[in-house]
UniProtKB/Swiss-Prot annotation:
Basic and acidic residues bias spans: 497-515
CDD domains: ASKHA_NBD_HSP70_DnaK-like
Modified sites of kind Phosphothreonine: T175
UniProt organism field: Kocuria rhizophila (strain ATCC 9341 / DSM 348 / NBRC 103217 / DC2201)
Record lineage: Bacteria, Bacillati, Actinomycetota, Actinomycetes, Micrococcales
Chain intervals with Acidic residues compositional bias: 605-623
Family: Belongs to the heat shock protein 70 family.
Source domain of life: Bacteria
Pfam families given in the database record: HSP70
Protein name: Chaperone protein DnaK
Length: 623
C-alpha cells in the first residue's frame, strides 16, 4: 500500500515526515540527518548530487551547484548547465525526489502522495510551480498548505479544549510570514484550526542575514589587503558558508572568529581572512532586516481585529528564529515570550504529515481552514474594481455575483480578472481576460451575467461567467504565468493605504457617472413611452436636462457631470407629477359618472356597516 508524506520544501533546508500509527514522525535522510539541505549539484561526470553531498562540494563546483532556488519559484529564472536549461521546478523536483527516496527507504514502501508546504504569502504562480515540482518528482500533490498553518496544526493539536489564538512567526531561509490562527477542540477532541489573518515578505529570510556578513567580510578583506573578491565565485562561496556558520554560532555565543586561509590569490600573494565578529556587530549589520518583520506582524493583528494581549501562544518557525535578536523582537511585538517546546526546523513538516493523514483518511479528528491573501474581482463600468472575494477569506471558497450589459444588443462581454486592494483595476494586477459570447440581443441592463470565482484549497483561482438567458458559459483558470510577484503585492497594499482617499473620490465619481448615464437612459425611454401623456413644456425641459447629462458624460469633467445629473434628478420629478395629475383627472371623471348610482345604494350599505375598529398588530403573525 502506497503512503502519503508531508514535506516542508524550504529555501535552505527541507524536511519530510509521515504518520506512523496516527502520530507524525520526522524521517532522517540517508546521511542520518533530519533536515536535508535544499542544494542540487551536477558533477562533471553527469551525476546529480542532492542535499548534504551537494552542499559539501559547492566550493569546488560553484558553477554547477544551485541553492536557495525557492526564491525563484514562479518566475522565468533558469540556470544552464552542460547546455541544458533548468527551471526552478526542475531543481526543486530533485530535492523532492531525494526526500521521497529517503522516505521510501525508511518505510519500506512506495510513496505516491504528498502534502507540500509553501509560505503563506506565495502567489498563484509560486504555488503552481511548487505543485509542478512535486509532479516532476513523481508524486501526486494532495494539497499545497501554508507553512504557518501547518506549524499551528502540529502545535495546536496538543492544546486543551478551549479556543485559543496562536500567532506563528515564520522566518525561514528565504521567506517570512506571520499568521494568526484560532484553534479549538470540542468535547469529542475534534480540532478546528482556522486562519484569521496572514501577511508576509517573500524576499526576507536567513539568506539576507548571511549576505550581510558576506558583505562585511568583503569590506574587511578589501580594506586590509586591497583585494576585491566580489567577483571571485569560489571565494564568495567560501564566505557564504562561513557566514552561515558564524550566524549559527552567534545564536549561542557572543562572538565568533571567521578564519579562511588562502581565500584567494592576487599578484601580491595569497589572501587570508581572520576576523572576529561579535553578536552586537552582527545585530547592528542586520537591524534593518529585523525591522522589516514589524509591519507584517502589525498588519495581521489589525486584519484580525484583535489586541496583542489576546494572543495565547506564540510559535517560532524556521531556523532563522533561533537568532536572539529575532526572539527579542517577537517578545517585544507580542508582549510574551515565544513557546520553547517546538522544533522550528521540523514543526512545519510534522503539520504537513498530519494534513496528509487527514486527506488520506488516516486521521479524522481535525479540520484545517486557510485563507487567501489578496482580494479578487472583475472590472466593471468606469474601470471600477468590483471585488467578489475579499482578502483573508477562508478557502476553499466560491462566490457568485450577477452583472449585466452596458450597451443595447451587446453580443458579448469581456471578463477581466484582477487581484489587489485598490478601488480601480488600473491600480491592481490583471490576472487574465476571457470573452463570454453569444448573448441574446436585448436592451442594456436586461441580460443576466453570473460571474463566479472559485478558489480551491491550494489557493489556485478559477473563474467562470454564464449568461443565465442562453446558458452560454466560459471559464478560465489562473495559471502561474499571470500571478503576482511579492513586489506587486507589497506595492498594491502600500498604494492602497497611501491612496485610500483619492481612490474613494474616484470611485464616487465613477459611480456618479454610471448612475447619471442610467438615469438619462431611463428618463429618455419614459418620455418616449408616455409621450402623449406628458405636457410639451415638461417634456422639453426634461429632455434638455437629459441631453445636458449626455454631453457632460462625453467629457472628463466630473463636476460638470455632477451638476447636470443633479439638475436632471430635480426635473425628472415633473414627469411623475404630470403623469400622476393625469391619472387623478381620469379617475375624477369616472367617479362623477357613477355618483348617481352610488347614492341609491348608500342607504342599504349603511345598514350593513359593522361598528368596529381596525387593529394593526405588528406582533400578529397572521396575514
Amino acid at each position: 500500500m502506497s503512503r502519503a508524506v508531508g514535506i516542508d520544501l524550504g529555501t535552505t533546508n527541507s524536511v519530510v515526515a509521515v504518520l506512523e500509527g496516527g502520530e507524525p514522525v520526522v524521517i532522517a535522510n540517508a546521511e542520518g540527518n533530519r533536515t536535508t539541505p535544499s542544494v542540487v549539484a551536477f558533477s562533471k561526470d553527469g551525476e546529480t548530487l542532492v542535499g548534504d553531498v551537494a552542499k559539501r562540494q559547492a566550493v569546488t563546483n560553484v558553477d554547477r551547484t544551485v541553492a536557495s532556488v525557492k526564491r525563484h519559484m514562479g518566475t522565468d529564472w533558469t540556470t544552464e548547465i552542460d547546455g541544458k536549461k533548468y527551471t526552478p521546478q526542475e531543481i526543486s523536483a530533485r530535492t523532492l525526489m531525494k526526500l521521497k527516496a529517503d522516505a521510501e527507504s525508511y518505510l519500506g514502501d512506495t510513496v505516491t502522495d504528498a502534502v507540500i508546504t509553501v509560505p503563506a504569502y506565495f502567489n498563484d504562480a509560486e504555488r503552481q510551480a511548487t505543485k509542478e515540482a512535486g509532479e516532476i518528482a513523481g508524486m501526486n500533490v494532495l494539497r499545497i498548505v501554508n507553512e504557518p498553518t501547518a506549524a499551528a496544526l502540529a502545535y495546536g493539536l496538543e492544546k486543551g479544549k478551549e479556543d485559543e489564538l496562536i500567532l506563528v512567526f515564520d522566518l525561514g531561509g528565504g521567506t517570512f510570514d506571520v499568521s494568526l490562527l484560532e484553534v479549538g477542540k470540542d468535547e469529542d477532541d475534534f480540532s478546528t484550526i482556522q486562519v484569521r489573518a496572514t501577511a508576509g515578505d517573500n524576499r526576507l529570510g536567513g539568506d539576507d542575514w548571511d549576505q550581510r556578513i558576506v558583505d562585511w567580510l568583503l569590506e574587511q578583506v578589501k580594506s586590509k589587503t586591497g583585494a576585491d573578491l566580489s567577483k571571485d565565485k569560489i571565494a564568495l562561496q567560501r564566505l557564504k558558508e562561513a557566514a552561515e556558520q558564524a550566524k549559527k554560532e552567534l545564536s549561542s555565543a557572543t562572538s565568533t572568529t571567521i578564519s579562511l586561509q588562502y581565500l584567494s590569490v592576487t599578484p601580491e600573494g595569497p589572501v587570508h581572512l581572520d576576523e572576529k565578529l561579535s553578536r552586537a556587530k552582527f545585530e547592528d549589520l542586520t537591524k534593518d532586516l529585523l525591522a522589516r518583520t514589524e509591519k507584517p506582524f502589525k498588519d495581521v493583528i489589525s486584519e484580525a481585529g484583535i489586541n496583542v494581549s489576546d494572543i495565547d501562544h506564540v510559535v517560532l518557525v524556521g531556523g532563522s528564529t533561533r537568532m536572539p535578536a529575532v526572539v527579542e523582537k517577537v517578545t517585544e511585538l507580542a508582549g510574551k515570550a515565544p513557546n520553547k517546546g517546538v522544533n522550528p526546523d521540523e514543526v512545519v513538516a510534522i503539520g504537513a504529515a498530519i494534513q496528509a493523514g487527514v486527506l488520506k483518511g488516516d486521521r479524522k479528528d481535525v479540520l484545517l481552514i486557510d485563507v487567501t491573501p489578496l482580494s479578487l474581482g472583475i472590472e466593471t463600468k468606469g474601470g471600477v474594481m468590483t471585488k467578489l472575494i475579499e482578502r483573508n477569506t477562508a478557502i476553499p471558497t466560491k462566490r457568485s455575483e450577477t452583472f449585466t450589459t452596458a450597451e443595447d444588443n451587446q453580443p458579448s462581454v469581456s471578463i477581466q480578472v484582477f487581484q489587489g486592494e485598490r478601488e480601480f483595476t488600473r491600480d491592481n494586477k490583471n490576472l487574465g481576460t476571457f470573452e463570454l459570447t453569444g448573448i441574446a440581443p436585448a436592451p442594456r441592463g436586461m441580460p443576466q451575467i453570473e460571474v463566479t470565482f472559485d478558489i480551491d484549497a491550494n489557493g489556485i483561482v478559477h473563474v467562470s461567467a454564464k449568461d443565465k438567458g442562453t446558458g452560454k458559459e466560459q471559464s478560465m483558470t489562473i495559471t502561474g504565468g499571470t500571478s503576482l510577484s511579492k513586489e506587486d503585492i507589497d506595492r498594491m497594499v502600500k498604494d492602497a493605504e497611501a491612496n485610500a482617499d483619492a481612490d474613494k473620490q474616484r470611485r464616487e465619481a465613477a459611480d456618479r457617472r454610471n448612475n447619471a448615464e442610467q438615469t438619462a437612459y431611463s428618463v429618455e425611454k419614459l418620455i418616449k413611452d408616455d409621450e402623449g401623456a406628458i405636457p410639451e413644456d415638461v417634456k422639453s425641459e426634461v429632455q434638455a436636462d437629459v441631453d445636458a447629462v449626455k454631453a457632460a458624460l462625453e467629457g472628463d469633467d466630473d463636476d460638470a457631470v455632477k451638476t447636470a445629473f443633479e439638475k436632471l434628478q430635480s426635473s425628472q420629478t415633473k414627469i411623475g407629477e404630470a403623469l400622476y395629475a393625469q391619472s387623478q383627472a381620469e379617475g375624477a371623471a369616472g367617479a362623477g359618472a357613477g355618483a348617481a348610482g352610488a347614492e341609491g345604494a348608500q342607504a342599504k350599505e349603511d345598514d350593513d356597516i359593522v361598528d368596529a375598529e381596525v387593529v394593526d398588530d405588528d406582533n400578529d403573525g397572521k396575514k
